[in-house]
């Protein structure tokens, strides 16, 4: 008789499988990042980071002329060292309104932009802390002001 795992453990295993599939579409060094943050983050957090990083690399390819001829898998840490604060501010602007790979409109408000920039900050901090990046422009980017939600009574 096989023992069934508790729900949260089943979900964790599903999320690990999903993360492994997602990392196959990201530059190889991203796997190191996910391994490095694994002890301090949940699988759902790492999946959200993987999604956010894929949006970032797509932005670089679509919107930055320096990287326009590159594929997502071809990015290296040396390329990340070339990113400036201005590039990241342009990324924040891009996040407000864009089209995804299925040509669907995507709109992000402050909260969504903050999450994506926070993911990027964690990503840059990890590689800066491990001395694989010389620069950390993400540390210099200010997060958008979060407007409080109305209280409905």
Task: Please place each PLM-identified region on the residue numbering.
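N-terminal DNA-binding module of tyrosine recombinases/phage integrases
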Residues: 1-47, 62
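N-terminal core-binding DNA-recognition domain of tyrosine recombinases/integrases
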Residues: 30-44, 54-150
């Amino acid at each position: 008789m096989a023992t069934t795992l508790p729900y949260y453990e089943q979900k964790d295993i599903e999320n690990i499988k999903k993360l492994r599939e997602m990392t196959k579409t990201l530059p190889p060094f991203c796997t190191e990042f996910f391994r490095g943050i694994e002890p301090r983050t949940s699988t759902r957090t790492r999946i959200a980071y993987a999604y956010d990083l894929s949006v970032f690399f797509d932005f670089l390819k679509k919107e930055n002329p320096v990287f326009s001829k590159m594929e997502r898998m071809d990015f290296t840490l040396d390329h990340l060292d070339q990113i400036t604060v201005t590039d990241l501010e342009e990324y924040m602007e891009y996040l407000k309104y864009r089209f995804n790979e299925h040509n669907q409109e995507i709109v992000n408000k402050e909260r969504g932009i903050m999450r994506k920039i926070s993911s990027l900050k964690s990503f840059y901090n990890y590689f800066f802390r491990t001395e694989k990046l010389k620069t950390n422009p993400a540390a210099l980017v200010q997060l958008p002001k979060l407007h409080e939600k109305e209280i409905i009574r």
